[in-house]
């Protein structure tokens, strides 16, 4: 451990405590933090990523959570002697002091700007997979999250699709990779197929997203979106992908949508052949309409 000067020791004691009974990182808390770390998409806490900006830190996970007061002093000295500015140091201490339930008092003592408090609160709650609390802090005015890629991936991998949509809509991070486009489109499609479809058309790999969107709504048995698909002015490539997927299974929603699509595209003969070979389709409303349509054209 680096040797502390007297003024540094006073600051340390003023921030934390030298009493063992005050030390919050017991085995239960330590295990919880390590579990949260393993559940992160890249096995890194947001605090790990922040610590990695300090020159010389190669393994942030070995520093947090500290296993003893000596370890905490070592982390304190690394931050104190680091190449980062005072405001960033205060942000690190604010995050650590949340574990000690002293962060609010500290922020008042050093006049830590509110937007930085909310930013660190957001990261703290993301690290603990408390997504609603995290988003409520990260979407406040003047808060500028600086790890949008990790935030998007974290929300998507934890199936927090509404929060992801809110984050993208409010913060407006550049969706400049296919993975980010994919996370957003496949979140959006769960709530608005039409909005997701229009977004998909502007993406770098629209047909790949189109196939993923169709698979998702079919697998989730989203009948309303399937009805909407049939009425869309699809391109030839989109139609080919759609027909291929619909013909891949004999499940009811696949068959219903395929029959409706064949009727809509005026492929009456193929629609009649499909319905005649399916007991399920013979009972459908689309089949009744199909036979009326066929009798009128005969």
From Swiss-Prot:
Sorted UniProt keywords: Cytoplasm, Nucleus
InterPro entries found in the cross-reference section: ELYS_dom
Primary location group: cytoplasm
UniProt source species: Schizosaccharomyces pombe (strain 972 / ATCC 24843) (Fission yeast)
Localisation per UniProt entry: Cytoplasm; Nucleus
Keyword check for DNA-binding: no
Full protein name: Uncharacterized protein ely5
Gene from which this protein is expressed: ely5
GO cellular component: cytosol; nuclear pore; nucleus
Any GO BP annotation: nuclear pore complex assembly
């Amino acid at each position: 451990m680096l040797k502390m000067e007297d003024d540094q020791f006073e600051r340390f004691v003023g921030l934390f405590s030298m009493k063992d009974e005050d030390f919050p990182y017991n085995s239960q808390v330590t295990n919880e933090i390590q579990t949260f770390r393993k559940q992160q998409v890249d096995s890194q806490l947001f605090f790990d990523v922040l610590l990695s900006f300090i020159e010389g830190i190669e393994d942030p996970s070995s520093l947090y959570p500290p296993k003893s007061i000596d370890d905490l002093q070592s982390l304190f000295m690394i931050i104190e002697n680091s190449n980062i500015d005072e405001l960033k140091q205060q942000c690190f201490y604010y995050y650590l002091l949340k574990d000690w339930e002293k962060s609010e008092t500290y922020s008042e003592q050093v006049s830590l700007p509110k937007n930085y408090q909310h930013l660190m609160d957001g990261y703290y709650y993301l690290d603990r997979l408390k997504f609603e609390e995290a988003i409520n802090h990260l979407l406040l005015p003047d808060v500028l999250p600086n790890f949008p890629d990790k935030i998007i991936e974290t929300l998507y991998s934890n199936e927090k699709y509404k929060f992801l949509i809110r984050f993208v809509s409010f913060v407006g991070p550049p969706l400049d990779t296919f993975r980010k486009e994919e996370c957003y489109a496949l979140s959006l499609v769960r709530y608005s197929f039409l909005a997701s479809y229009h977004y998909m058309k502007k993406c770098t790999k629209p047909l790949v997203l189109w196939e993923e969107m169709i698979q998702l709504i079919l697998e989730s048995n989203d009948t309303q979106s399937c009805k909407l698909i049939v009425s869309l002015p699809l391109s030839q490539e989109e139609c080919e992908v759609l027909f291929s997927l619909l013909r891949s299974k004999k499940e009811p929603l696949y068959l219903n949508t395929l029959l409706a699509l064949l009727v809509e595209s005026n492929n009456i003969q193929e629609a009649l052949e499909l319905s005649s070979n399916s007991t399920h389709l013979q009972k459908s409303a689309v089949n009744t309409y199909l036979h009326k349509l066929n009798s009128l054209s005969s």
